[in-house]
Regions:
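Short glycine-rich anion-binding loops that position phosphate/pyrophosphate groups of nucleotides
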Residues: 1, 22-24, 57-59, 174-175, ...
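Acidic, Mg2+-coordinating active-site environments of NTP-dependent enzymes
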Residues: 8, 14-167, 192, 217-226, ...
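Short amphipathic alpha-helix with an adjacent loop that forms part of the alpha/beta core around
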Residues: 9, 255-263
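Nucleotide and nucleotide-moiety/phosphate-recognizing core
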Residues: 163, 200, 237, 252-255, ...
Length: 293
């Protein structure tokens, strides 16, 4: 607590955006509300005349509005009354659903968006970016053009092709319960077999054991047939997952096991906190020079 507030005088932002309150850094903040209040320090420190960009769909939207010191708010999401939203359905296509199309609605008009990112949470992130762009005067067509030029951040739901032609969804950059759920939502939409390579989720404090048990349950609910886990905490996930779950003490052994089983009808999600260095697993499974198909 207080870290965001301490930085605000240095930056003096005219736009403040919090994408969501996620189950991360619970070890330091104690609860989800603690996380949300720490993130809300951004809104509390905005100057008069600045714009607060608020996720209207988030559980803590009302808290952030109460904390907002700016004179202007631009909301985004699917909630009724949101300033920046979507009309109609989201249509996914491309390898592992890596292209999403939708109609963007802003106070200035509408535009068709072709977003080259997987995951419904990335549509929500795109709405946040659109709301910020609207706040600085960019029209709907300009926003749509910018969103269409986006590319995945390395290790954030990057779709690649592994040995044997399997799809690999590289989400190895970091992990917490919220981002794992988002990754599993993407995996659940894939055809064929769905596998999960899971590393520890760090900085969860007293919630760590239950969070990893819930990870095993969530994987099963997402239709995952095989769970390959590594890390001190992921044994809880394997125990909860049951049949098809395997725990490894060594990354090389995990890679050898996964590589020996992969086939073209498999999609595998790779997810874990930075401490696991799961990018090494990705590098071992993806042939050099191959990123997608």
């Amino acid at each position: 607590p207080g870290e965001v507030a301490a930085l605000l005088p240095l930056v003096q932002p005219t736009i403040g955006l919090v994408t969501n309150a996620g189950a991360e850094h619970l070890e330091g903040f104690g609860s989800m509300e603690g996380v949300a209040r720490a993130e809300g320090e951004l809104f509390a420190g905005l100057a008069h005349g600045a714009s607060a960009i608020v996720n209207a769909d988030d559980t803590y939207a009302a808290l952030w509005r109460d904390m907002n010191a700016a004179t202007r708010e631009v909301s985004f999401g699917r909630a009724a009354g949101a300033d920046v939203t979507i009309r109609g359905d989201i249509r996914a296509s491309g390898p592992a659903g890596s292209i999403q199309e939708f109609t963007l609605v802003t106070p200035d008009g509408e535009a068709h968006v072709r977003l080259p990112l997987a995951g419904r949470h990335n549509v929500q992130n795109a709405l946040g970016a659109a709301a910020a762009a609207h706040a600085v005067g960019i029209d709907a067509q300009g926003i749509a053009a910018g969103l269409g030029r986006m590319r995945p951040v390395r290790g954030r739901l990057e779709v690649k092709v592994a040995a044997g032609g399997a799809y690999l969804i590289d989400d190895s950059y970091n992990a917490n319960p919220s981002s794992l759920d988002a990754g599993l939502d993407v995996l659940a939409e894939q055809r064929g077999e769905r596998w999960l390579v899971l590393g520890d989720m760090a900085e969860l404090g007293d919630a760590a054991h239950e969070a990893h048990r819930q990870a095993g349950r969530a994987a099963r609910s997402a239709g995952v047939s095989r769970l390959f886990a590594i890390g001190a905490m992921t044994g809880d996930a394997v125990s909860e997952f049951g049949a098809g779950g395997e725990w490894f003490a060594d990354g090389d052994a995990l890679v050898a096991r996964v590589a020996g089983l992969l086939s073209e009808d498999v999609t595998v999600l790779i997810k874990g906190s930075r401490v696991n260095r799961l990018e090494r697993v990705v590098a071992a499974l993806v042939p050099a020079g191959v990123e997608g198909r």
